[in-house]
């Protein structure tokens, strides 16, 4: 196949709505180049959703970077690839197979393309990346690294992108290492000029910023941020001064980001010393133990982990639940069980988190769907943990945690104050005439009054224990006292329904007997799937769950529909099971839409599953009273 002409297959023509996928070898420096491409699209004012699909080894295995450009602002995976940049021979068969008919493959034409890789229904664009690098560079490492920058430059030409934007980003990226600016600029220029000379108008995919094609982008004020960074900032603004952790993919960057920003935002202005502490513990058990100890002492503390760490922490979570000690646990979910796929995403810790530990335990869970919500919910988590005196578990995942995503700027109210809940201070204890009871339900809401150690020289001191006790924290094995305590804890969990974020409900454009429930990272593809199905005449109301325990609106939503599709990324339909277990609803009404191969679910997969489920269904639509709405995608 010629390296100077694209094949004449049918062409996909699209403006501001397509998917580019880079296929690379892990450890070759491709991530920085691919991010440069995504950042340039974003800088041009277009919604972009990049995601890094990487292996769990350090070097040598296939890695991918998928970039979705969507004028409508869809952030989830669409499914399919319109343009593939194939520079990894090891995965090329699979990579080419993913390309949509009429799509494009950019490949290294230094060697002739194997006939077995050629499809008559797609367009091939050969650029001799290796040959160019051999000609321009003598250092082997430079040849490896600059090949990536060369293909980014070529894409800038093929897609009619503003080349100045790429140059600006390179200059910004290497402003502290100016010697690297010139060679990177040269590599960009090499790729751009080659593609411009040999492939004018060869690709029907275009990016147009502003004007009639994207008029709503003129006031583009969003940011690119990953969920883990947003969580770290939420912890700082939420008042956290202590973190204990054990490194575990994909949660590690939460504490790394917390440390980086705390060094700027949590410094005593008078002494210049840190107003925070971080401990890398010997294991996950030690980490959660330190968090519970710090929280008991009045500090706002957290840990970050993933599924395997959550399993190890479960006994300590039971202690915090039963002894009623605040704590925040960040769970960045990955594919399990056991080691599973450490660098792939799932939502498969739901049940283990909700009921973590032995005995009758129930934990409050939060389900953020965006980077902005990661920030907001983390701040809320610290308030909730102290108001409810219980662990709060943030249920993020690798897709949200480790990938940059389009987000509105994070918002913070400088007048906001920490909500520490029911705390008795020294003055309160001094004025009390009755005996202080740590576990007395004074307000009949299940939430008792706590004290901080050292609040009073002679009043309010108790032994915090994981064994049974009475209302005054005195050890007892009396069955009646135990039952009273357990029933109060259940009452507190019911009270939590009035504290946690409510679900977001969006009504369809007309009456329908179908509903859809999603949460976390299934939300964006879920909303997109609903729009696709509506164009086909299939209407669905939606509910985005944001917290557990579920409030009455969840029961009402299911009751108002004949069928409700529950979209989640795990094998066993864990959210569906949790809904059935905790709510008064008929199991047959809830239909699972499941996806668990480790990649984020796509709108296409959701649409296909729902089409199949309702193919022969002709139930008459019922009237509903859907009040809340959510417009974000």
Regions found by a protein language model. Name each.
Residues 2-238, 242-244:
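Active-site cofactor/cluster-binding pocket
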Residues 17, 133, 174, 197-220, ...:
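Gly-rich Lys/Arg/Thr-decorated short loops/hinges at beta-loop-alpha junctions or inter-strand turns
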Residues 4-6, 51, 165-167, 178-186, ...:
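Flexible, glycine/charged-enriched surface loops at secondary-structure junctions
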Residues 217-218, 224-238, 377, 382-633:
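Flexible, low-complexity linker and terminal segments
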Residues 99-105, 120-122, 276, 299, ...:
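A short helix->loop->beta-strand "cap" motif at the edges of active sites that frequently abuts
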Residues 14-99, 242-245, 249-355, 364-385, ...:
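Thiamine diphosphate
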Residues 86, 106-108, 128, 305, ...:
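Short beta-strand segments
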Residues 55-58, 112-115, 132, 252, ...:
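Short gly/pro/ser/thr-enriched loop/turn and capping motifs at secondary-structure boundaries
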């Amino acid at each position: 196949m010629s390296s100077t002409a694209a094949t004449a297959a049918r062409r996909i023509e699209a403006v501001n709505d397509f998917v580019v996928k880079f296929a690379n070898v892990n450890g070759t420096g491709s991530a920085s180049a691919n991010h440069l491409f995504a950042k340039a699209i974003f800088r041009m004012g277009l919604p972009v959703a990049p995601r890094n699909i990487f292996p769990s080894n350090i070097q040598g295995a296939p890695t991918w970077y998928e970039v979705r450009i969507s004028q409508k602002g869809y952030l989830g995976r669409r499914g399919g690839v319109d343009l593939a940049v194939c520079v990894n021979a090891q995965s090329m068969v699979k990579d080419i197979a993913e390309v949509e008919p009429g799509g494009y493959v950019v490949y290294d034409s230094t060697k002739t393309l194997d006939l077995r890789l050629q499809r008559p229904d797609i367009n091939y664009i050969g650029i001799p990346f290796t040959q160019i690098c051999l000609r321009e560079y003598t250092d082997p490492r430079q040849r490896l690294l600059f090949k990536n920058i060369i293909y980014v430059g070529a894409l800038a030409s093929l897609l009619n992108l503003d080349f100045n934007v790429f140059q600006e980003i390179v200059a910004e990226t290497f402003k502290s290492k100016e010697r690297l600016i010139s060679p990177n600029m040269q590599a960009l220029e090499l790729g751009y000029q080659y593609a411009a000379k040999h492939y004018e108008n060869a690709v029907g995919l275009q990016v147009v910023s502003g004007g009639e094609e994207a008029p709503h982008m003129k006031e583009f004020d969003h940011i690119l941020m990953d969920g883990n960074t947003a969580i770290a900032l939420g912890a700082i603004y939420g008042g956290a001064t202590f973190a204990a952790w054990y490194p575990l993919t994909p949660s590690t960057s939460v504490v790394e980001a917390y440390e980086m920003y705390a060094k700027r935002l949590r410094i005593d202005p008078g002494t210049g010393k840190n107003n925070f502490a971080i401990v890398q513990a010997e294991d996950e058990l030690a980490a959660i133990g330190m968090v519970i100890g710090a929280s008991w002492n009045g500090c706002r503390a957290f840990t970050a982990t993933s599924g395997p760490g959550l399993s190890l922490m479960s006994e300590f979570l039971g202690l915090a639940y039963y002894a009623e000690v605040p704590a925040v646990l960040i769970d960045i979910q990955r594919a399990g069980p056991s080691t599973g796929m450490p660098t792939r995403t799932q939502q498969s810790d739901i049940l283990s988190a909700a009921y973590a530990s032995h005995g009758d335990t129930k934990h409050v869970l939060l389900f953020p769907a965006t980077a902005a919500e990661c920030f907001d919910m983390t701040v809320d988590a610290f308030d909730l943990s102290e108001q409810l005196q219980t662990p709060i578990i943030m249920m993020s995942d690798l897709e949200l945690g480790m990938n940059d995503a389009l987000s509105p700027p994070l918002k913070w109210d400088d007048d906001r104050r920490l909500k520490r809940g029911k705390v008795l201070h020294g003055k309160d204890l001094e004025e009390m005439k009755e005996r202080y009871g740590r576990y007395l339900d004074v307000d009949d809401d299940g939430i008792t009054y706590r004290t901080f150690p050292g609040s009073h020289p002679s009043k309010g001191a108790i032994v915090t224990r994981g064994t049974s006790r009475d209302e005054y924290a005195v050890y007892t094995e009396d069955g009646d006292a135990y039952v009273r305590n357990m029933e109060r804890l259940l009452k507190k969990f019911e009270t939590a329904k009035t504290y946690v974020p409510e679900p977001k409900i969006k009504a369809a454009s007309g009456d329908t007997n179908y509903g859809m429930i999603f949460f976390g990272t299934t939300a964006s593809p879920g909303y997109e799937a609903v729009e696709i199905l509506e164009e086909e005449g299939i209407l669905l109301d939606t509910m985005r769950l944001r917290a557990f325990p579920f409030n009455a609106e969840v029961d009402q939503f299911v009751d108002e529909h004949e069928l409700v599709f529950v979209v989640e990324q795990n094998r066993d339909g864990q959210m569906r099971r949790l809904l059935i277990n905790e709510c008064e609803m008929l199991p047959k009404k809830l239909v699972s839409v499941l996806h668990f191969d480790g990649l984020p679910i796509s709108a296409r997969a959701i649409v296909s599953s729902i089409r199949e489920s309702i193919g022969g269904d002709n139930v008459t639509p019922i009237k509903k009273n859907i009040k809340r709405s959510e417009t974000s995608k």
